[in-house]
Amino acid sequence: MDDSREWIRIGAAAQRAGMSVKTVRFYSDEGLIPTAGRTEGGYRLYHQQVVEELHLIQNLRGLGLALSTIRSYLAAKRQGACHCEQLKQSMREQQQAIHQKVAALQNLQQELNETMQGWVNCGGRLDAKLV
């Protein structure tokens, strides 16, 4: 480690990224971010640049992308390769999955509306048909 000012402990990385130490440790254990080593006290050390990667991971997770997709993208990015097309394809697949979920929720909403409409004249009877 050439310059100690470039390396930060896990707590500092977590704080700068706005996430818990547990989350940073998880991402590290899952191979999403590289660990530079450990202090004499056993704390994990990271390059300051990892904070940017943690923000990126957080954003991509927020879009619903799988950790495996994010891991592949970050590995390629670190090697200077562009996997934008692969990432865009994953995002298109996520869009399709969201579209299907929205359609299913709209169907459920319609079923709820129809069921409640059937109760308009139930008169508070316990024997009213529920479905």
Language-model region placement:
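Basic helix-turn-helix/winged-helix DNA-binding cores
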Residues: 1-75
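C-terminal regulatory/oligomerization modules of transcriptional regulators
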Residues: 1-4, 81-131
